[in-house]
């Protein structure tokens, strides 16, 4: 049976890990053992934070809608309920954008909500 030497494969694996660890601080960028641990942990953080990002943006949109709604005399929950009653189907991302960038359009939506709740 032929002898298997894996130096080339090991070098390629190490190179891959060190490329992923580029930009890390201290030994984490150039010592294979610490770099591998740091890259693994970075992957865990990245996976977790892809989930957290969705929550964080939804929270931000709700805050912006709430601010716009309060200028029109509603609380956030009253405003969302009014949208439902009025039959206006619009997601929070779009509502937050309208509240921040187009106050006239948001006022028109708020007037429709006010009419639906009256």
Swiss-Prot record:
GO terms for biological process: ribosomal large subunit assembly; translation. InterPro entries: Ribosomal_bL20, RIBOSOMAL_L20_CS, Ribosomal_protein_bL20_C. Keywords: Ribonucleoprotein, Ribosomal protein, RNA-binding, rRNA-binding. GO terms for molecular function: rRNA binding; structural constituent of ribosome. GO terms for cellular component: ribonucleoprotein complex; ribosome. It comes from the Bacteria. CDD domains: Ribosomal_L20 (cd07026). Belongs to the bacterial ribosomal protein bL20 family. Binds directly to 23S ribosomal RNA and is necessary for the in vitro assembly process of the 50S ribosomal subunit. It is not involved in the protein synthesizing functions of that subunit. This is Large ribosomal subunit protein bL20. It comes from Caulobacter vibrioides (strain NA1000 / CB15N) (Caulobacter crescentus). The gene is rplT.
């Amino acid at each position: 049976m032929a002898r298997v030497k894996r130096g080339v494969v090991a070098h390629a694996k190490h190179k891959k890990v060190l490329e992923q660890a580029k930009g890390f601080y201290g030994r984490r960028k150039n010592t294979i053992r610490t770099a591998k641990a740091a890259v693994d942990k970075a992957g865990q953080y990245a996976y977790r934070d892809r989930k957290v990002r969705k929550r964080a943006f939804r929270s931000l949109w709700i805050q912006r809608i709430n601010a716009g709604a309060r200028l029109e005399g509603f609380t956030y929950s009253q405003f969302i309920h009014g949208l439902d009653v009025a039959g206006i189907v619009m997601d929070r991302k779009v509502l937050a954008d309208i509240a921040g960038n187009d106050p006239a359009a948001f006022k028109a939506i708020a007037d429709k909500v006010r009419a639906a709740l009256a």
